């Protein structure tokens, strides 16, 4: 096993422990608490994959961080923080929308790289909007926290979430997963829109209505439908 993978996990465990202490003292805002919950699931998955105990890893991570802080001067810390790019946390969904449980009548699940896509195939002829909470850096999506598909009535009918056992994903991973989710929902004649925030940072190839261009498969399906309609009209004449 790569020692850097182990030490990274150990440090992440300790830093999560520190953030948990901040949350317990009611010093964290909603995005902070949101990331805390998500990262806890991720650490559990990584610990299971690596075969490492989280409590033991936390103790070792503390020793690593303490050694680094002891060796680093205040001036070096200031320079590091000044040169580090700052990310922004953007929210389409409320805490209630993110934490709400939902169920599927006809569940379908697909894993696309480090992301899990879930949708309810029983949903038909609905207007659906995709919303997401994520961080942005350099005007591009950095980390997806959670994406969900909502009907006009507010029901959740689809979701994209990072796999705890496979931390880390790219902007392209998210974009591909969004395409899969949209394609699955549109297959049942649903109309899907993407939130303005997602359009700007994660789904740039969309038109002015916030809908992505048709895929080649969708274009072929539409062409067959049009040809069929034309034939019927000719026969009626």
Curated annotation (Swiss-Prot):
It is found in: Host nucleus; Host cytoplasm. Keywords: Eukaryotic host gene expression shutoff by virus, Host cytoplasm, Host gene expression shutoff by virus, Host mRNA suppression by virus, Host nucleus, Host-virus interaction, Inhibition of host innate immune response by virus, Inhibition of host interferon signaling pathway by virus, Inhibition of host PKR by virus, Inhibition of host pre-mRNA processing by virus, Inhibition of host RIG-I by virus, Inhibition of host RLR pathway by virus, Interferon antiviral system evasion, RNA-binding, Ubl conjugation, Viral immunoevasion. Residues 226-237 have a biased composition (Basic and acidic residues). Upon interferon induction, ISGylated via host HERC5; this results in the impairment of NS1 interaction with RNA targets due to its inability to form homodimers and to interact with host EIF2AK2/PKR. Its main location: host cell. InterPro entries: NS1 (IPR004208), NS1A (IPR000256), NS1A_effect_dom-like_sf (IPR038064), uS15_NS1_RNA-bd_sf (IPR009068). A motif (Nuclear localization signal) lies at residues 34-38. One of its GO terms (molecular function) is RNA binding. Homodimer. Interacts with host TRIM25 (via coiled coil); this interaction specifically inhibits TRIM25 multimerization and TRIM25-mediated RIGI CARD ubiquitination. Interacts with human EIF2AK2/PKR, CPSF4, IVNS1ABP and PABPN1. Belongs to the influenza A viruses NS1 family. The dsRNA-binding region is required for suppression of RNA silencing. This is Non-structural protein 1. It comes from Influenza A virus (strain A/Brazil/11/1978 H1N1). The lineage of its organism: Viruses, Riboviria, Orthornavirae, Negarnaviricota, Polyploviricotina. The gene is NS.
């Amino acid at each position: 096993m790569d020692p850097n993978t182990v030490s990274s996990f150990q440090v992440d465990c300790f830093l999560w422990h520190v953030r948990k202490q901040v949350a317990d003292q009611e010093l964290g805002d909603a995005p902070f608490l949101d990331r805390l919950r998500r990262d806890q699931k991720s650490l559990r998955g990584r610990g299971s994959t690596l075969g490492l105990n989280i409590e033991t890893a936390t103790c070792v991570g503390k020793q690593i961080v303490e050694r680094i802080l002891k060796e680093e001067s205040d001036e070096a810390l200031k320079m590091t923080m000044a040169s580090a790019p700052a990310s922004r946390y953007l929210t389409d969904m409320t805490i209630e929308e993110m934490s709400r449980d939902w169920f599927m009548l006809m569940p379908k699940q697909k894993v696309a790289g480090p992301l899990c896509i879930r949708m309810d195939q029983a949903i038909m002829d609905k207007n659906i909007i995709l919303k997401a909470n994520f961080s942005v850096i350099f005007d591009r999506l950095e980390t997806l926290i959670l994406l969900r598909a909502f009907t006009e009535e507010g029901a959740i009918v689809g979701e994209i979430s990072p796999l705890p056992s496979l931390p880390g994903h790219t902007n392209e991973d998210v974009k591909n997963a969004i395409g899969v989710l949209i394609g699955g929902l549109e297959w049942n004649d649903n109309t899907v829109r993407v939130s303005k925030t997602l359009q700007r940072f994660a789904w740039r190839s969309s038109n002015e209505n916030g809908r992505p261009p048709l895929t080649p498969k969708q274009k072929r399906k539409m062409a067959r439908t049009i040809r069929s309609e034309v034939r019927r009209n000719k026969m009626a004449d």
